[in-house]
């Protein structure tokens, strides 16, 4: 399914498995950053703008960039992370921002998640983000802490799907080691 707009419509969100949306939702993109440590995989998370929660590097789309390029930009800006990103998203999830007692209320977003293997960390534009590596289980806990149960389930599914893709590609690359460092992830 291709999306050409920065908004997803209710039918498309319901096709993702959620009946919560009855209107068009704004779109964000996330870089699900990972690295390999021998047989182990770690995920890179950043602090939210408020600093007390963890998230994937994510942000708005940009008409001048593809969605994967926008996710790659977020990884660089928020985490100083550079590497190989998949050209297509591997998962969609819902994200709520804000609190109901504030004047702005709660805003829901549909987030396209792009898998990105990190090869280098260097200076970042947003120093308060504190990029940190976590095991898959610790990443799930950090993403869930202080959040609604539905968001915790959404991000747990992102980690699980990412691990499936990483392990699939690891098995494939194991058969063709000469291609290991000259690829972008795709399936």
Predicted regions and their residues:
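Short loop segments at secondary-structure junctions
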Residues: 35-38, 117-122, 136-138
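Short, solvent-exposed loop/turn segments that connect beta-strands within catalytic domains
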Residues: 36-42, 104-106
């Amino acid at each position: 399914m291709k999306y050409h707009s920065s908004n997803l419509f209710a039918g498309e969100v319901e096709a993702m498995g959620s009946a919560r949306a009855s209107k068009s939702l704004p779109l964000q993109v996330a870089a699900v950053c990972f690295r390999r440590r021998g047989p182990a995989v770690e995920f890179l998370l950043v602090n939210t703008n408020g600093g007390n929660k963890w998230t994937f590097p994510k942000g708005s789309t940009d008409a001048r960039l593809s969605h994967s390029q926008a996710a790659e930009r977020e990884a660089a800006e928020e985490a100083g992370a550079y590497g190989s990103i998949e050209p297509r998203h591997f998962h969609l999830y819902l994200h709520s921002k804000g609190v109901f007692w504030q004047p702005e209320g709660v805003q829901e977003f549909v987030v396209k998640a792009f898998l990105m293997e990190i090869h280098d960390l260097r200076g970042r534009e947003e120093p308060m983000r504190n990029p940190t590596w976590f095991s898959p289980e610790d990443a799930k806990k950090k993403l869930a802490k202080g959040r609604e149960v539905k968001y915790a389930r959404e991000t747990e599914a992102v980690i699980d799907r990412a691990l499936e893709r990483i392990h699939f590609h690891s098995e494939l690359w194991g058969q063709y080691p000469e291609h290991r460092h000259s690829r972008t992830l795709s399936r």
